[in-house]
Amino acid sequence: MSDILQTILARKAEEVAQRRAQRPLEDLQVAVASAPPVRGFVRALQAAVANGDPAVIAEVKKASPSKGVIRPDFRPADIAVSYEFGGASCLSVLTDVDFFQGADAYLQQARDACTLPVLRKDFVIDAYQVYEARVLGADCILLIVAALDDTQLATLSELAMSLGMDVLVEVHDIDELERALQVPAPMIGINNRNLRTFEVSLQTTLDMQKAVPRDRLLVTESGILGPQDVALMRDAGIHSFLVGEAFMRVEEPGEGLRQLFFAA
């Protein structure tokens, strides 16, 4: 298969094997005990929504496979502070090295600079990465349904929750949503970007939202670029957003966030 997701996953399997060779799983399992206390990720989003506000997961992202380098002047700690000041509920930090120019250190720098819960945004395919995320200080991990079989999805989500983390289970179509709902994670992300082609359509969320049970927190991801996009979602009853690129392209990301979501 030549699609982008398969290319990323093949490389990720190699990366996990290399990391495991450098630092055994047993070391990580011991290190979890001294990881920083978990900050409630879902709780922070729910609090914003309950207050009538948009719940924004603001992304700390230097580059992407489709756009190349998005933010050349990339300082994760400064970005995190700016986001918190701008009204973000949570952060999402890219740690994938090969395709997004991310780094584990970026997550630590961002989290240390603010009080917000942080999602480790990566392609999780192995229990090793779940322990790794918690050791780094992550409060939530991403599980992409298109990247996992049902057994992996169940096992990895259960492990993450047993370590105190929240899980954002990401889907792109109805078949993936049906699989995601077999997992008791309280949060479903609908990615408007097709990870096989990287094409974006906000209609993806609008078409699928009614199939998401009310007891799951629905997050719309990708393609939220202007106030009209926010209004479209909020009018449809969707109040949680994951946004990155729109903020990374402005000098003060937090001000970009405030303008997009909170400027009356």
Curated annotation (Swiss-Prot):
The keyword Transmembrane helix does not apply. One of its GO terms (biological process) is L-tryptophan biosynthetic process. Signal peptide: none annotated. Its EC number is 4.1.1.48. One of its GO terms (molecular function) is phosphoribosylanthranilate isomerase activity. PROSITE patterns: IGPS (PS00614). It is an enzyme of class 4 (lyase). InterPro entries: Aldolase_TIM, Indole-3-glycerol_P_synth, Indole-3-glycerol_P_synth_dom, Indole-3-GlycerolPSynthase_CS, RibuloseP-bd_barrel. Pathway: Amino-acid biosynthesis; L-tryptophan biosynthesis; L-tryptophan from chorismate: step 4/5. CDD domains: IGPS. It catalyses: 1-(2-carboxyphenylamino)-1-deoxy-D-ribulose 5-phosphate + H(+) = (1S,2R)-1-C-(indol-3-yl)glycerol 3-phosphate + CO2 + H2O. It comes from the Bacteria. Keywords: Amino-acid biosynthesis, Aromatic amino acid biosynthesis, Decarboxylase, Lyase, Tryptophan biosynthesis. Belongs to the TrpC family. PANTHER family: INDOLE-3-GLYCEROL-PHOSPHATE SYNTHASE, TRYPTOPHAN BIOSYNTHESIS PROTEIN. This is Indole-3-glycerol phosphate synthase.
